Amino acid sequence: MEIVFLETISLGDDINLDRFDELGHVTKYRDTPVELVPERVKDADVVVINKIPMNEKTLAGASHLKLVAVTATGMDNIDRAYTDSHGILSANVAGYSTEAVAQHTFALMFYVLHKLAYYDHYVKSGAYCTSAQFSHFEQKFSELDGKTWGIVGMGAIGKRVASHAQEFGCNVIYYSTSGKNTDQLYE
C-alpha cells in the first residue's frame, strides 16, 4: 500500500508517524504546492492531507486512490461528488478539537468581556501601584449570568459551547446553518 502525506507541517513536530510504516510504503512531504499534488498522488492508495484541495484537477491521475484522510474536522476542501463518483472514500477526525475550540471560544469571550487587554496594560504600566484608590473601574465589565448567547451552527462544537454557556447562566439561542438541527434544548 502506498501512503502519501502531503503536508506534515500541519501535524506539528511532536507527532511520530512511524506506525504508518507497518501499513505499507510511506512518503512524507512537509508541504505540497497544489501544482505538485497530481505527481505526488499518482501512485497513492491513501493520501493524508489537511487543507490541500482534492478535486478532479489534483486527483485525475490517482487511479489507485482508495482513501483521502483529512487531519482536521472540516472536509470542504474535498470535492465529494468527484471522490464519490470514483470510489474514493474520505475520512476526517471529527471531534478531535471540540473541547479545545469550545475552551478557546470562552477564552476569547472573557478577554473581550472583561477588558483584559486594558486591565493588563493598566497593571503592567504601574498605574495600579500609584493609584490613590484600591479599585479601578475605568472600563466596565459584567458577568455572563443572565446574558443571551447566540450560536450559529449547532454541531458538536456549537453544542459544547452552548452547554458551557448555560453553565455560566446564559440563555442560549442558535441558528441552524443546515436546517437539520432542531435541538429542543435551545431556542
Model region roles, listed by residue range:
Residues 1-44:
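N-terminal glycine-/charge-rich "phosphate-binding" loop or analogous flexible N-terminal tail
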Residues 76-88:
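Rossmann-fold NAD(P)-binding glycine/threonine-rich loop
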